């Protein structure tokens, strides 16, 4: 199990990203617009820099929903390989069966 604080911090980051997404996208559009004057684009970049760092999408870490493990994460199932194996063997993940040949 991952530390509870790490899992909670990541959840907080997800909510911050969701709240800041529209504002960040608008500022980035202004910054990337070559038709606008450089002063306006510079002001937008300063505003973007003043927003919280945890509002950036790259700060989110994919973690297992079951254990909180950050590595060996399957995006489609939102769980780690270990949790997938345990729940798959118990038959709790639909469509997952132990292979045999």
UniProtKB/Swiss-Prot annotation:
* Disulfide-linked positions: none
Protein family (similarity comment): Belongs to the universal ribosomal protein uS14 family.
List the taxonomic lineage.
Bacteria, Pseudomonadati, Pseudomonadota, Alphaproteobacteria, Hyphomicrobiales
The UniProt function text for this chain reads: Binds 16S rRNA, required for the assembly of 30S particles and may also be responsible for determining the conformation of the 16S rRNA at the A site.
Database matches in InterPro entries: Ribosomal_uS14 (IPR001209), Ribosomal_uS14_bac/plastid (IPR023036), Ribosomal_uS14_CS (IPR018271)
Q: Which organism is it from?
A: Rhizobium leguminosarum bv. trifolii (strain WSM2304)
Q: Which UniProt keywords are listed?
A: Ribonucleoprotein, Ribosomal protein, RNA-binding, rRNA-binding
Name used for this protein in its record: Small ribosomal subunit protein uS14
The entry lists its GO molecular-function terms as: rRNA binding; structural constituent of ribosome
Looking up SUPFAM superfamilies in the UniProt record yields:
Glucocorticoid receptor-like (DNA-binding domain) (SSF57716)
Q: Which Pfam families match?
A: Ribosomal_S14
Q: What GO cellular component term, any one, is given?
A: small ribosomal subunit
What PROSITE patterns does this protein map onto?
RIBOSOMAL_S14
What does UniProt give as the signal peptide span?
Answer: none
Top-level division of the source organism's lineage: Bacteria
Single GO biological process annotation from the record: translation
Q: How does it assemble?
A: Part of the 30S ribosomal subunit. Contacts proteins S3 and S10.
